[in-house]
Amino acid sequence: MSIAALIDHTLLAPDVTAQHIRTLCREAVDHGFATVCVSPTRVRLAADELAGHAPRVCSVIGFPSGAHLSEIRAAETKAAVNDGADEIDMVINVGAVKDDDWDTVESDISAVVDAAGMAIVKVILEVSELTDEEITRACQAAERCGADFVKTSTGYSRHGATAEAVSLMRRTVGDRLGVKASGGIRTHNDVATMLRAGATRIGASAGVALLVDEEAL
C-alpha cells in the first residue's frame, strides 16, 4: 500500500494564500492523501475544493502555542466543523502540563472533543517539550477525554517527531487510539521509521516529495 493514504497533507504557514490551498487540495486528490491539514480560516475553501473527493479536511485548533482558553478552543472547533472540517488537531497547553495542572489539560481536551461532535480529534503533545512521564500522562489524559489520536508535534517547536516518542505513545495507548507522527518528516525512510515505531498517521508538508522518494526506492 502506498504511504499516501496515511498522510495528512499539511500547509500551515502564516502566508498561505487561497491559491496555495487550491493547489494543496488538488495534490491531495491526485495522490490520494488522507486529509489536507489547514488553518481554521482555510477550512471552508478546502472543504469546497474537496467536495465529492476522498481526502478529508483537517483543521488545527489552538495552534501552535496551545495557550488558549477552553471556551475559545470549543468555539474555534465548532466553527471549523461547521465550515466542513472532518478532523481536528488540537494543541495541549504545555505550560499546564509543566505545572502539573491536569485539570486544565483535560478541560481543554474535553472542550474540543465535545465541540467536535463526530469529527476525529487528535491531541498534539509537543513531545520536544515534555519528559517521558509527561508524554505518558498526556496520552492517558487524551484517552480519558475521548480523543481519537495522539500526535507528536506542531512542527513549530525545537524538534518534531522521534521514533522514541512515537514508540512511547504507542505503548501508552495500545491499539485504542491512533498515533500521528509529525514534524521533520521529509523522506520515505523517515516515514518508515515512524510506522515501525507505531505511527498510524503521518503529518507532512512535504507529502508529494515523500511519494517521489517512495517511487525512487
Curated annotation (Swiss-Prot):
- Keywords recorded for this protein, A-Z: Cytoplasm, Lyase, Schiff base
Name of the featured protein: Deoxyribose-phosphate aldolase 1
Which cellular components does GO assign to this protein? cytoplasm
According to its UniProt record, the EC number is 4.1.2.4
The cross-references to Pfam families, in alphabetical order and at most eight, read: DeoC (PF01791)
Q: What is the role of the protein in this entry?
A: Catalyzes a reversible aldol reaction between acetaldehyde and D-glyceraldehyde 3-phosphate to generate 2-deoxy-D-ribose 5-phosphate.
The record ties this protein, via InterPro entries, to: Aldolase_TIM, DeoC, DeoC/FbaB/LacD_aldolase, DeoC_typeI
Enzyme group, top EC level? lyase
The UniProt entry's GO biological process terms, in alphabetical order, are:
2-deoxyribose 1-phosphate catabolic process; carbohydrate catabolic process; deoxyribonucleotide catabolic process
Pathway listed for it is:
Carbohydrate degradation; 2-deoxy-D-ribose 1-phosphate degradation; D-glyceraldehyde 3-phosphate and acetaldehyde from 2-deoxy-alpha-D-ribose 1-phosphate: step 2/2
Q: Where is the active site?
A: D89 (proton donor/acceptor), K151 (schiff-base intermediate with acetaldehyde), K180 (proton donor/acceptor)
